[in-house]
Structures are given as structure tokens and as C-alpha cells.
């Protein structure tokens, strides 16, 4: 699914997102949600140079907005599952970047759009591996696509570290409610 798909619910959702931002109702989006936020706010969504499936490092951008959201954190391992990416919409600031996908997250005031998945659980990882097996096979030569064994290696410790970052982001976001 793409934010660019011609589905009957996308245009009303984009308008809903624009209205929420205009009224300063805090919004948060993960992956497709981040892409929809970007598009609603004047950004674009297009194919990423490579498919990203599995674990990968993202870096915290070197700017004050990123520091407000992530403190002194420099980089962390996160989960990815996408073939498209968003541009940073006008007025927003990139707060996370990656080797294979430059725009991993942006902030616009109290609003947070992410390409990466900080919300993962062990059950989600296993479910996505099972339901995405064909996609993993199709894109296995991508430098950013992992196999099931790689994704599940040390799964709980990886998730524990990721949840520390997620808590930081969600705490910052929910403080604005």
C-alpha cells in the first residue's frame, strides 16, 4: 500500500491530517502513517532506492529539534519494512536519517512522522515475517533486506533497546497532549 494509491479513503485522511496540524492536535505516524503525514503537509512520497526489511541503524540528526526529541542519543537499531520514502515536508525538521533511506523521521512542532518502526513487538516481527515471506524472497538481494533468521536473532534484547528509544519519543510526544 502507498500513500499515492488512488483509494477512496486517502484524500479525506490527508485532509484530516492537515486539519489536525492546523488545529495543533498532536499527530504521530509510523511508516505509511509518516508517509501520509508528509504528503498531507506538502511533502512527497516516492520509491526508496532500496527496499528496507529488517533491522538497521538510524542516526539522530545533528540539530536542536532532534535533540529535543531524542536527547543525547546518537544512533540506534530500529526495525524497517518499506519500499517507499517521504520527503521532509515544508517547515518540518529531519530528526532521524539512515544509510539506505535518508528521511527516517521528521518533527513539525508537536507532530512526529516516522519511516522506521519503533513500535515493534516480538509478535509483530514474527507475523510480518510470515506474511511478508514472498516480499522478502523477491527483494533478498537488496543490501537492506534481511532473512527471517537475521531478523529474529537476539530479538528480545533488540526489542528492549528499541523500546527505550520508543519510550523517549512517545514520552516527548505525549507530554504535548
Show where each model-derived region lies.
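Pocket-forming structural segment of enzyme catalytic cores
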Residues: 41-124
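Acyltransferase
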Residues: 120-177
Amino acid at each position: 500500500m502507498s500513500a499515492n494509491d488512488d483509494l477512496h479513503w486517502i484524500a479525506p485522511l490527508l485532509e484530516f491530517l492537515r486539519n489536525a496540524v492546523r488545529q495543533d492536535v498532536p499527530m504521530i505516524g509510523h511508516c505509511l502513517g509518516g508517509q501520509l503525514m508528509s504528503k498531507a503537509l506538502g511533502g512527497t512520497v516516492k520509491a526508496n532506492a532500496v527496499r528496507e526489511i529488517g533491522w538497521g541503524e538510524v542516526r539522530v540528526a545533528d540539530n536542536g529539534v532532534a535533540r529535543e526529541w531524542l536527547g543525547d542519543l546518537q544512533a540506534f537499531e530500529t526495525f524497517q519494512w518499506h519500499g517507499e520514502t517521504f520527503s521532509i515536508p515544508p517547515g518540518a525538521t529531519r530528526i532521524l536519517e539512515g544509510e539506505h533511506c535518508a528521511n527516517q523521521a521528521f518533527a513539525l512542532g508537536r507532530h512526529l512522522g516516522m519511516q522506521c518502526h519503533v513500535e515493534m513487538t516480538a509478535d509483530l516481527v514474527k507475523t510480518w515475517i510470515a506474511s511478508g515471506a514472498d516480499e522478502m524472497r523477491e527483494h533478498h538481494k537488496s543490501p537492506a533486506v534481511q532473512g527471517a533468521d537475521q531478523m529474529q536473532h537476539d530479538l528480545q534484547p533488540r526489542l528492549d533497546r528499541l523500546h527505550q528509544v520508543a519510550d523517549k519519543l512517545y514520552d516527548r510526544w505525549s507530554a504535548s497532549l
